[in-house]
Regions:
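Short hydrophobic targeting helices and cationic amphipathic motifs
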Residues: 4, 10-11, 19, 23
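Residue-level detector of alpha-helix boundary/anchor positions
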Residues: 12-18, 175, 307
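Short, Lys/Arg-enriched N-terminal segments with co-localized hydrophobic residues
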Residues: 22-30
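Extended, low-polarity transmembrane helix blocks
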Residues: 31-105, 124-131, 141-234, 250-265, ...
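Membrane-interface interhelical connector segments
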Residues: 105-117, 230-252
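Conformational-control "hinges and anchors"
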Residues: 136, 267
Length: 334
């Protein structure tokens, strides 16, 4: 059914007086009609099931993560920026699980982007989607988290090598193509940093090597995004992609310039290996502010759209999570 026909169907089913009969049939009809015309109900009815599914799984992982943080006492023990760093796994995991849901609701579309030379496209679409959802719950519950983080780092690195770089190579002048490449690279760096921080004692060399690789995987995208946001402040900030910042966003271009400045300072510190924990935390905070003041309003306005609503909200929150995952893996004192 189309959105309009779904709404008509809803009113036909729930707008009958006999469903709302109390002591007065007409009064029941008025109550039901008012309910059917309420903004919340109308928004739910006209929102496609694909969008609802992604938001549901996203919210479920978010809720589990929040409960875990507070029940384990992590929030009470953390101080200063460490309180923000606590949310790194949560901010990464919730969008990841939401994107995993799309592999089940948009299977054919997801399968179509798998390289032609790889067999069983539908299988990989389902398999990766299931893994993303499972990994999301793993990150927030800390069950087999090192395994999940390691596999996520490998998965996103393979995405970069097998899909993103070949696409960008067809048109190297496409700055958005490079933006996608570096975004996926950072999505590999975050969980790689987490896995490195969980390396068993006695393997300090391996831990330092992987943590350094993860730092570069995040620092390079942060610096490139800083440059892009200075040049194209009229485009959406955080992860600077093609859409222009909507006119209804309060402050408009100021969010791009704010993020660009913080990214520039934080990115340089991450690249040279100085004050890395604080640098990553401050970059993460700037992304979170962009998420709250830019992408949450966009998601509300575009609540019926995956492409223009949930996906941009999720991408930016996941980027925030990946930077905070890096922060959590960096030394406390330098």
């Amino acid at each position: 059914m189309t959105d309009r026909s779904k709404l008509s169907h809803f009113r036909r089913v729930f707008g009958r007086g006999d469903l709302g009969q109390c002591s007065n049939g007409q009064k029941g009809s008025v109550v039901i009609e008012s309910l059917a015309n309420s903004p919340a109900i109308l928004a739910l009815v006209v929102t496609p099931s694909t969008v609802i599914g992604s938001y549901f799984v996203f919210s479920l992982v978010l809720a589990v993560g929040l409960v875990t943080i507070f029940l384990r006492g992590d929030w009470q023990k953390a101080r200063g920026l460490d309180k923000l760093i606590l949310f790194g796994p949560l901010f990464y995991a919730a969008p990841l699980a939401g994107f995993g849901t799309e592999h089940f609701t948009l299977t054919v579309a997801i399968a179509s982007i798998v390289p032609k030379w790889i067999p069983w496209h539908l299988f990989w679409a389902y398999f990766v989607g299931a893994c993303f959802i499972a990994a999301g719950f793993s990150l927030v519950t800390k069950i087999q988290v090192r395994l999940s983080a390691s596999l996520l780092a490998l998965t996103f690195f393979l995405f970069v090598v097998l899909m993103d770089v070949p696409v960008w190579a067809h048109n190297p002048r496409d700055r958005f193509g490079l933006t996608f490449v570096l975004r996926e690279l950072s999505f590999s760096g975050g969980p790689l940093a987490l896995a490195a921080s969980l390396t068993k004692p006695g393997r300090e060399r391996a831990k330092n090597v992987f943590a350094t690789i993860a730092r570069y995987f995040v620092a390079i995208p942060v610096l490139f995004y800083s440059f892009e946001q200075f040049l194209h402040a009229d485009h959406v900030p955080g992860v600077p992609l093609e859409p222009l910042t909507p006119a209804y966003i309060y402050g408009h271009a100021i969010w791009s310039y704010l993020a660009a400045v913080v990214y520039a300072v934080g990115g340089v510190l991450l690249l040279v290996g100085k004050k890395t924990r604080a640098a990553a935390a401050w970059v993460g905070l700037s992304v979170l502010l962009v998420e709250l003041f830019v992408y949450v309003p966009i998601a509300v306005v575009e609540r019926a759209s995956l492409d223009n609503g949930f996906n941009y909200l999720g991408d930016t929150l996941m980027f925030c999570g990946t930077v905070l995952l890096l922060a959590g893996a960096m030394p406390r004192e330098e």
